[in-house]
From Swiss-Prot:
InterPro entries named in the record: Ribosomal_bL33 (IPR001705), Ribosomal_bL33_sf (IPR038584), Ribosomal_zn-bd (IPR011332)
GO molecular function: structural constituent of ribosome
Gene that this polypeptide is encoded by: rpmG1
A GO cellular-component term linked to this record: ribonucleoprotein complex
GO biological process, one term: translation
Keyword line: Ribonucleoprotein, Ribosomal protein
Family: Belongs to the bacterial ribosomal protein bL33 family.
Pfam families, per the entry: Ribosomal_L33
UniProt name for this protein: Large ribosomal subunit protein bL33A
Length: 48
């Protein structure tokens, strides 16, 4: 089963992306993606 999660930028805390995640994984998702407000690639973490 997969569930929808929201990713937020670590620098500006803006919620830019949403993605799907497997429910069996316990750790939070961390992906390097482009942030429109920072105008650069930053680490995006899964929010609650």
């Amino acid at each position: 089963m997969r569930k929808k999660v929201v990713l937020s930028c670590e620098e500006c805390k803006n919620r830019n992306y949403s993605t799907m995640k497997d429910t069996s994984s316990v750790e939070r998702l961390e992906i390097k993606k482009f942030c429109k407000t920072c105008n650069k690639h930053t680490v995006h973490k899964e929010t609650k």
